[in-house]
Regions:
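A contiguous, well-structured pocket-lining segment that forms one wall/lid of small-molecule binding clefts
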Residues: 75-105
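Phosphate-coordination/substrate-recognition cap region in phosphate-metabolizing enzymes
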Residues: 1-76, 84-85, 96, 137-158
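Active-site-adjacent alpha-helix immediately C-terminal to a catalytic or transition-state-stabilizing loop
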Residues: 6-7, 93, 100, 104-158
Length: 158
């Protein structure tokens, strides 16, 4: 549902002449929620918490950043965003995420929506974000868990 993924999808659809096809949007494929780090660039984050800690948060499988508290500058803008009026439920809305938590968020959509359509023989384009895609890749190949922090995703259309 985030703008970058939507723009990427529109570019792809235009290029392949499929601009009128149905599009499903879900918060479950959003980028990882960096919690209290949201809105800070890498330099600011490193100055406040130290470069080593920032790398742990960014690349660790199961270590989340600090949570986004209700007094955070962007809390209301995110939690009350009209795109999320119906989904996720308030108790499901993440306040922070590790890669592990991101996977737990993406897999219900993968298993419940994408896989059934693939089994029906449908062609699917997934326009999402790096960490949500990393989570799906990890699910597809559990051997990657030990090197997940080194995984860069490349997308190519032929």
């Amino acid at each position: 549902m985030l703008t970058r993924a939507q723009n990427t999808l529109q570019s792809i659809l235009k290029e392949i002449g499929q601009e009128g096809i149905p599009i499903a949007k879900t918060w479950r494929l959003n980028e990882r929620h960096y919690g209290g780090l949201t809105g800070m660039n890498k330099t600011e984050t490193a100055q406040k918490y130290g470069e080593e800690q920032v790398q742990i948060w960014r690349r660790s499988f199961d270590t989340p950043p600090p949570p986004m508290e209700p007094d955070h500058k962007y809390y209301d803008a995110i939690v009350k965003d009209p795109r999320y009026a119906n989904d996720p439920k308030p108790e499901e809305f993440p306040k922070f995420e590790s890669l592990k938590l991101t996977i737990e968020r993406t897999l219900p959509y993968w298993n419940g929506t994408i896989i059934p359509q693939l089994k029906e023989g449908k062609n699917i384009i997934i326009a999402a974000h790096g960490n949500s895609l990393r989570g799906i890749v990890k699910h597809l190949d559990s051997k990657l868990i030990s090197s997940m922090h080194q995984t860069n995703l490349l997308i190519k259309l032929n």
